[in-house]
C-alpha cells in the first residue's frame, strides 16, 4: 500500500497547532491548504484575499485554496467541535466570562446570502451588509471566540430557514456551549439583549446565570404605588483598560422602589453633564457585586466591540469575497475562529515560553495561567 506523502511544512507553530485538526482532512492537499491559509492570514499582507495568500505561500494560483473552502469534503461542524474541545481541555472545568457581540461586515450589492441594509454595530451605522451574532469567552485576561451564527433577515430567508431574532440566536448559542460542558460565571451583552426579556433575559434566568447587560435610558421597571426612584451618590472608580492604563469613571446605583435581585446602574465619564456617548445604563443580576466590579466588567464588552474588531480585521475577517452562506460559514465563521485561537497561542507562547517545541496543551495551559497580566491582543 502506498503511503501518502507528508504535508509540506510551513511555520513551525502553525504546523504544531494545525496538527490538532489533521484528522478532519481526507487528503494531504486539503490539510496543506488549511495550513497555508493560517500562514497567509497571520502575514503582513494588507488584504488577506485568496490570490494574495496564494502568492505569499508560493502557490501558482488560488485554485487550491478556493477548492478547499468551497468543495473540499471537510466537515465544518467537526472543525468547530475540535476547536471547542481544545478550549475545554485547557479550561479544566473552570468558568469563563461570556460576551455576546454582533460582528458585521459591509457588502456591496445584494448577491451575498442574507445581506441587507441593517445596523452594523462595529461600524456604528446602518449600511448594506451581513451581521453575525458571536459569542466570546474571557478567561484570565484572554479573549477568544467560541461560536457564531449569521443573522438571517426575515425578507432574505431561503428554503428551509427559520427566522430567529438576534437575542434568540444568542440564547441558543449559550445553551449549546453549556451542553458541551462550558461553565460561565458572568454573561455580558448590549442593550439589544438587555431589553429582550422574553427571548434572552428569561433564558439567562432559566439557566441561573449571572449577567450584566446594557439597557436603554427609558427602560421600564414597574414599581408599587407610593414607591419612588432613588439615585444614590456617585462613586468614582478607575476603569482598567487592555494595556493596563486607567481612566476615572463614575457610577451610581438607581433603585426603583425597593432593591431586588435585579439592580440598575448609571456609568459615565462626566457626572455633571452626562454626555450621551460616554454615559451608559446597565442592569445586573450578580449577588453582592460592587459598583467598581460592575464598571470594569461591563467595560469588557466594550473591548470586544472596538478592540477585538481591529484584531479580527488583521486576520482578514472581511477580506474574503464569498457570497454563499455555506462558504461564509466555513471561512469567516469557523475557519477564521480556528485561526484566531491559533494566533492566541503564538502571541502568548513567545512571551511565556521560548521553546516552541513544547506540547500544544502545555503552551495553551501556560496562556490560561497568565492570571490577568494583560488582555490578549492579536499581535504583541
UniProtKB/Swiss-Prot annotation:
Q: Name one GO biological process term.
A: DNA recombination
Top-level taxonomic group: Bacteria
List the InterPro entries: IS701-like, IS701-like_DDE_dom, RNaseH-like_sf
A GO molecular function assigned to this protein is: DNA binding
* Pfam short name (any one): DDE_5
| Keyword flag Chaperone | no
* Key words, A-Z: DNA recombination, DNA-binding, Transposable element, Transposition
**Keyword Ribosomal protein (UniProt):** no
PANTHER family linked to this entry: TRANSPOSASE
What does this chain do? Involved in the transposition of the insertion sequence.
Q: What is this protein called?
A: Probable transposase for insertion sequence element IS701
* Taxonomic placement: Bacteria, Bacillati, Cyanobacteriota, Cyanophyceae, Nostocales
Amino acid at each position: 500500500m502506498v503511503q501518502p506523502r507528508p504535508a509540506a511544512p510551513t511555520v513551525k507553530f502553525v504546523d504544531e497547532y494545525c496538527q490538532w485538526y489533521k484528522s478532519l482532512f481526507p487528503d494531504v492537499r486539503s490539510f496543506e491548504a488549511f495550513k497555508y491559509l493560517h500562514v497567509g492570514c497571520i502575514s503582513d499582507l494588507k488584504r488577506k484575499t485568496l490570490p494574495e495568500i496564494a502568492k505569499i505561500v508560493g502557490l501558482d494560483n488560488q485554485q487550491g485554496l478556493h477548492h478547499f473552502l468551497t468543495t473540499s469534503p471537510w466537515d465544518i461542524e467537526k472543525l468547530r467541535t475540535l476547536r471547542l474541545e481544545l478550549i475545554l481541555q485547557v479550561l479544566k472545568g473552570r468558568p469563563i466570562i461570556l460576551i455576546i457581540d454582533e460582528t458585521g461586515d459591509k457588502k456591496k450589492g445584494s448577491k451575498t446570502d442574507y445581506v441587507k441594509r441593517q445596523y452594523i454595530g462595529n461600524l456604528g451605522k446602518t449600511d448594506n451588509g451581513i451581521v453575525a451574532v458571536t459569542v466570546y469567552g474571557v478567561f484570565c485576561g484572554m479573549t477568544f471566540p467560541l461560536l457564531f451564527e449569521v443573522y438571517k433577515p426575515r425578507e432574505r430567508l431561503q428554503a428551509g430557514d427559520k427566522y430567529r431574532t438576534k437575542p434568540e440566536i444568542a440564547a441558543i448559542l449559550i445553551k449549546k456551549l453549556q451542553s458541551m460542558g462550558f461553565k460561565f460565571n458572568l454573561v455580558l451583552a448590549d442593550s439589544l439583549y438587555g431589553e429582550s426579556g422574553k427571548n434572552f433575559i428569561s433564558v439567562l434566568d432559566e439557566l441561573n446565570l449571572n449577567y450584566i447587560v446594557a439597557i436603554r435610558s427609558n427602560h421600564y421597571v414597574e414599581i408599587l404605588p407610593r414607591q419612588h426612584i432613588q439615585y444614590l451618590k456617585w462613586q468614582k472608580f478607575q476603569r482598567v483598560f487592555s494595556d493596563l492604563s486607567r481612566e476615572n469613571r463614575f457610577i451610581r446605583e438607581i433603585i426603583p422602589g425597593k432593591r431586588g435581585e435585579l439592580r440598575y446602574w448609571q456609568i459615565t465619564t462626566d457626572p455633571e453633564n452626562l454626555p450621551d456617548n460616554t454615559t451608559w445604563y446597565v442592569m445586573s443580576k450578580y449577588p453582592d457585586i460592587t459598583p467598581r466590579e460592575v464598571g470594569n466588567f461591563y467595560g469588557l464588552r466594550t473591548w470586544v466591540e472596538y478592540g477585538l474588531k481591529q484584531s479580527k480585521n488583521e486576520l482578514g475577517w472581511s477580506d474574503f469575497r464569498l457570497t454563499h452562506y455555506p462558504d461564509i460559514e466555513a471561512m469567516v465563521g469557523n475557519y477564521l475562529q480556528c485561526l484566531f485561537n491559533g494566533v492566541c497561542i503564538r502571541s502568548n507562547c513567545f512571551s511565556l515560553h521560548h521553546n516552541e517545541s513544547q506540547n500544544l496543551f502545555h503552551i495553551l495551559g501556560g496562556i490560561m495561567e497568565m492570571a490577568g497580566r494583560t488582555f490578549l491582543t492579536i499581535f504583541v
